[in-house]
């Protein structure tokens, strides 16, 4: 991989910021649930009070990005409409309605009389988030961090610097008004600082990158800090021979055009050969009328597609109104294609045959496998998590959309009355190992 990024050592200014966030995170980790909820409400209040300033900053960012020729996908993510801002503010409040993820008892055992073991959830500490464009992500991530008792260091794309700065200022004012330390939320604005974050293992406990495949892989390979995230969103939808044709058309269209710049939008449509003629006869004009460029394999082109796909197309996350189509002989071939090219984000099947659906869902190794529904449902808010800090495609947990439950870890608490191991070794005491 070309070394387009460098990992500098953090300078004194960055170290000072990191130390402030670390100390603030310790305070917040000890803050009662009701006070963390109170902080979220104040954060939302200050976002509302500063909404005019935030939208003006976003208009300036958007205008500048347009002049620089930034891609349509990034421009779409950058734009913060009044409706999107209001939804983000409401999302901050709704995070407060979620169950407290901190101090939850997962295990409680009596090891011996008077010797009690508990496993309880605790905050991770300081989160380091690196993301592109989407300024609404600042609200989501910050609210989840505070709700789960964590501090957060944020680095958004430079194209959104004015918007992100305005949002973070409002969030910090809300924190301060609530009585919590405003330093729990910190925004970095330079590329150098975002890369130097990778050397802050003494301050940051988890890095969550949300950006290009190249950036995510670079971060995973160049830090000693644990990394949670996904590099690509190459999602597939398979139209089985026993699919309901109208359902297949509706779900395929929604999975692509509802928000093509999203990582849960499909990039490849796999179609069973025996339903392909009837499906494509309706799908081609439907997608064309929605400005979707269709490219496909030889069999798809023979059935009416204008553009032939290359090998690279099956590996590409378009994040745009472009869709690759491949005709397959059976569900096994569809699964083989997905296992080869999927980014393990979300893959779906449309079929009325429950056995085929179960086979597909059990074998495809993605964080989300869907039956007869749009891949666009792969989202923390739509799952009822309130919001998400990111999506993980790794096999170990957390996996899929990561909400509050993915921002806590656990700790073992053992309370006794002078118990010593030697008494158990000598037979003076016995283990009971009783669940409480």
From Swiss-Prot:
InterPro entries, sorted: Ald_DH/histidinol_DH, Ald_DH_C, Ald_DH_N, Aldehyde_DH_dom, G-glutamylP_reductase_CS, Glu-5-SA_DH, GPR_dom
Molecular function via GO: glutamate-5-semialdehyde dehydrogenase activity; NADP binding
NCBIfam families given in the database record: PRK00197.1, proA
Main location: cytoplasm
Any one of the GO BP annotations: L-proline biosynthetic process
EC number: 1.2.1.41
PROSITE patterns: PROA
Pathways per UniProt: Amino-acid biosynthesis; L-proline biosynthesis; L-glutamate 5-semialdehyde from L-glutamate: step 2/2
Cellular localisation: Cytoplasm
Reactions that this protein is recorded to catalyse: L-glutamate 5-semialdehyde + phosphate + NADP(+) = L-glutamyl 5-phosphate + NADPH + H(+)
Keyword Amino-acid biosynthesis: yes
Record's function text: Catalyzes the NADPH-dependent reduction of L-glutamate 5-phosphate into L-glutamate 5-semialdehyde and phosphate. The product spontaneously undergoes cyclization to form 1-pyrroline-5-carboxylate.
Keyword terms, alphabetized: Amino-acid biosynthesis, Cytoplasm, NADP, Oxidoreductase, Proline biosynthesis
Cross-referenced HAMAP family: ProA
Keyword NADP part of the UniProt annotation: yes
Pfam families xref list: Aldedh
Origin species: Prochlorococcus marinus (strain MIT 9215)
GO cellular component, one term: cytoplasm
Enzyme class name: oxidoreductase
Annotated SUPFAM superfamilies: ALDH-like
Family: Belongs to the gamma-glutamyl phosphate reductase family.
Protein name in the entry: Gamma-glutamyl phosphate reductase
Domain of life where this protein originates: Bacteria
Signal peptide: none
């Amino acid at each position: 991989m070309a070394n387009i990024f460098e990992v500098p050592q953090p300078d004194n200014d960055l170290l000072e910021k990191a130390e402030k966030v670390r100390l603030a995170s310790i305070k917040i980790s000890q803050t009662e649930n009701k006070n963390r909820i109170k902080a979220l409400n104040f954060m939302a209040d200050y976002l509302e009070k500063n909404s005019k300033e935030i939208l003006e900053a976003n208009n300036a960012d958007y205008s500048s990005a347009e002049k620089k020729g930034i891609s349509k996908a990034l421009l779409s993510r950058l734009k913060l409409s009044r409706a999107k801002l209001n939804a983000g503010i409401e999302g901050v409040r709704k995070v407060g309605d979620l169950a407290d993820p901190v101090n939850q008892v997962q295990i409680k055992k009596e090891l011996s009389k008077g010797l009690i073991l508990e496993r309880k959830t605790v905050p991770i500490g300081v989160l380091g988030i690196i993301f592109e464009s989407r300024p609404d992500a600042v609200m989501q991530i910050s609210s989840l961090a505070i709700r789960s008792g964590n501090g957060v260091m944020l680095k958004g794309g430079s194209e959104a610097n004015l918007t992100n700065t305005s949002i973070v200022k409002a969030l910090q004012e809300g924190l301060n008004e609530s009585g919590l330390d405003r330093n729990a939320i910190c925004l970095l604005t330079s590329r150098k600082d975002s890369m130097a974050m990778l050397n802050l293992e003494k301050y940051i406990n988890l890095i969550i990158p949300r950006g290009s495949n190249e950036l995510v892989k670079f971060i995973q390979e160049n830090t000693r800090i644990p990394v949670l995230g996904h590099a690509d969103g190459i999602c597939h939808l398979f139209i089985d021979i026993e699919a309901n044709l109208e359902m297949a058309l509706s779900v395929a269209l929604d999975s692509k055009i509802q928000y093509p710049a999203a990582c849960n939008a499909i990039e490849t449509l796999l179609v069973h050969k025996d339903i392909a003629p009837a499906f494509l006869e309706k799908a081609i004009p439907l997608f064309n009328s929605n400005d979707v460029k269709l490219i496909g394999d030889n069999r798809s082109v023979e059935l009416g597609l204008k553009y032939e796909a290359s090998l690279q197309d099956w590996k590409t996350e378009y994040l745009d109104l472009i869709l690759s189509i491949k005709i397959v002989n059976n569900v096994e071939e569809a699964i083989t294609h997905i296992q080869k090219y999927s980014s393990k984000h979300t893959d779906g099947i449309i079929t009325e045959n429950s056995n085929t659906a179960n086979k597909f869902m059990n074998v495809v190794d993605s964080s989300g496998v869907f039956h007869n529904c749009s891949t666009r449902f792969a989202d923390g808010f739509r799952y009822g998590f309130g919001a998400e800090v990111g999506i993980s495609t790794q096999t170990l947990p957390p996996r899929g959309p990561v909400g509050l439950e993915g921002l806590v870890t656990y700790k073992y608490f053992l309370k006794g009355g002078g118990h010593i191991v030697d008494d158990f070794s000598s037979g003076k005491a016995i283990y009971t190992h009783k669940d409480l």
